[in-house]
C-alpha cells in the first residue's frame, strides 16, 4: 500500500467516556485508568458475515481511513464452523501523531479491527489504543492521540448505528508496562523488546522503500515454506517519515493462538465452540523497517512478549504449556527475512 490519505475524523463518545471514567470530572485528559486490550464495537450486527465485512470496509473508507489489510483470518479446525476477518486501517493524521514519537512508535500502527462470529451472532472488535499505546508509545504522553484513535474507530462503525456497543475485554491493565509472568517470562519496557532481525547498507537495494519492496517480494516467494507458512499481508509506505511497515501473518498461527486463549477470562463465552475468534484484531504481526546510521534495519517485537501483549488473559498455565510457539514463529520470520535480503 503506497497511498497516503488526507482526512481524519475526531469525534464519537467512547474515547471520552473511557477517559472520563479514568480521570473524573474537571481533570485534563490523561491515559491513566484500567483498560482492556480489546474494544467490542458492534454486537449482533445484522445482514450476515459477508455483509458486515463489506459495511465495515465501507465505513472505514467513508470515515477517511485507508484499508491496508483485508483478509480472512485462520480459525481452529476442531469443532469451529465460524469465521473471522481482519481489516487494518491508517490515516495520514494518525500516522503523523504516532510517528511524532519516533520511527519505532510505528509498532502502534495500523489500527486493526476484527469481524468474528460466534453462537450469539456477528460482531466487530478492535485492539484498544488506550491500552496498547501506553505500552508501545508512552505511559502518559499519547493520551489525546489514543482518544482520537478510539473516536475514529467509533466513526468507522457508525453505519451499524443501534448495534454499536462500548465494552472492553482481554487483559485489563492499569499501566502500559507488561511485567514478567512468574517472574521469568517476557516482561519489561517495550523498547527493550524491539529486536533487529536484519540490517543491510541503505544503498544495497537503493534505499529504504526499495529494501522493503525487496523484502516483501522475498517473503511472498517463501509464503508456503516452513511450518507456520508466514506470509506478508501488506506493505505500508511511510518512507517520507523514515519508516516502512510489512504485516506478517499465518492462518495456522492465528488458529493456534485463538485455540490457546479460548474465552480468556470471560466465563460467559467458555461454552462457545471457538471463542478465541474474538481476538482476531491481534494480527497481523509487524515488521518495521527504519533507516539508521546508513543502514536499513528490519525490526520486530520479541514474539513471546507480543503474545503477552495481546493474549495475556490466556493465563500463566497456557503460556507455560505453549512456550515453544513464539520462538518457532520468530525463528521462521527471521529465516525468511534473512533469505530475502542476504
Sequence positions of predicted segments:
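Bacterial N-terminal signal peptides that target proteins for export
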Residues: 2-13
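Bacterial N-terminal signal peptides
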Residues: 11-22
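Sec/Tat signal peptide C-region and signal peptidase I cleavage site
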Residues: 24-30
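Terminal, regulation- and interaction-focused segments at domain boundaries
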Residues: 30-79, 138, 158-245
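Intrinsically disordered, low-complexity acidic regions enriched in Pro/Ser/Thr
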Residues: 32-34, 46, 294, 333-341
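Ser/Thr-rich, low-complexity intrinsically disordered terminal regions
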Residues: 49-53, 57-104, 108-109, 129-132, ...
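Acidic/His-rich structured neighborhood in mature extracellular/periplasmic domains
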Residues: 103-140, 145
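C-terminal partner/receptor-binding element of secreted or periplasmic proteins
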Residues: 130-172, 313-342
Amino acid at each position: 500500500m503506497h497511498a497516503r490519505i488526507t482526512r481524519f475524523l475526531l469525534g464519537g463518545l467512547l474515547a471520552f467516556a473511557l477517559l472520563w471514567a479514568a480521570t473524573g470530572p474537571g481533570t485534563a485528559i490523561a491515559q491513566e485508568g484500567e483498560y482492556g486490550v480489546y474494544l467490542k464495537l458492534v454486537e449482533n450486527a445484522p445482514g450476515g458475515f459477508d455483509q458486515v465485512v463489506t459495511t465495515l470496509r465501507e465505513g472505514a473508507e467513508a470515515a477517511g481511513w485507508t484499508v491496508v489489510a483485508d483478509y480472512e483470518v485462520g480459525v481452529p479446525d476442531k469443532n469451529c464452523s465460524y469465521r473471522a476477518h481482519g481489516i487494518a486501517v491508517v490515516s495520514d493524521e494518525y500516522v503523523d501523531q504516532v510517528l511524532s514519537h519516533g520511527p519505532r512508535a510505528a509498532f502502534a500502527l495500523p489500527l486493526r479491527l476484527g469481524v468474528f462470529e460466534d453462537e450469539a451472532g456477528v460482531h466487530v472488535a478492535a485492539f484498544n489504543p488506550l491500552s496498547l499505546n501506553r505500552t508501545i508509545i508512552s505511559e502518559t504522553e499519547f493520551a489525546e492521540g489514543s482518544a482520537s484513535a478510539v473516536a475514529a474507530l467509533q466513526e468507522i462503525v457508525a453505519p451499524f448505528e443501534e448495534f454499536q456497543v462500548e465494552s472492553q475485554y482481554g487483559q485489563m491493565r492499569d499501566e502500559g508496562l507488561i511485567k514478567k509472568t512468574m517472574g521469568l517470562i517476557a516482561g519489561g519496557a517495550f523498547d527493550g523488546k524491539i529486536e533487529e532481525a536484519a540490517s543491510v547498507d541503505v544503498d544495497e537495494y537503493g534505499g529504504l522503500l526499495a529494501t522493503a519492496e525487496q523484502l516483501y517480494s522475498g517473503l511472498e516467494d517463501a509464503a508456503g515454506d516452513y511450518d507456520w507458512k508466514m506470509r506478508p499481508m501488506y506493505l505500508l509506505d511511510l518512507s517520507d517519515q523514515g519508516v516502512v511497515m510489512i504485516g506478517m501473518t499465518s492462518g495456522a498461527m492465528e488458529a493456534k493462538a485463538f485455540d490457546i486463549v479460548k474465552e480468556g477470562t470471560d466465563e460467559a463465552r467458555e461454552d462457545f465452540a471457538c471463542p478465541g475468534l474474538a481476538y482476531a484484531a491481534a494480527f497481523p504481526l509487524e515488521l518495521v523497517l527504519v533507516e539508521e546510521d546508513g543502514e536499513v534495519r528490519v525490526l520486530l517485537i520479541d514474539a513471546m512478549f507480543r503474545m503477552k501483549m495481546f493474549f495475556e488473559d490466556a493465563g500463566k498455565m497456557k503460556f507455560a504449556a505453549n512456550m515453544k510457539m513464539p520462538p518457532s514463529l520468530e525463528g521462521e520470520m527471521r529465516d525468511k527475512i534473512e533469505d530475502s535480503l542476504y
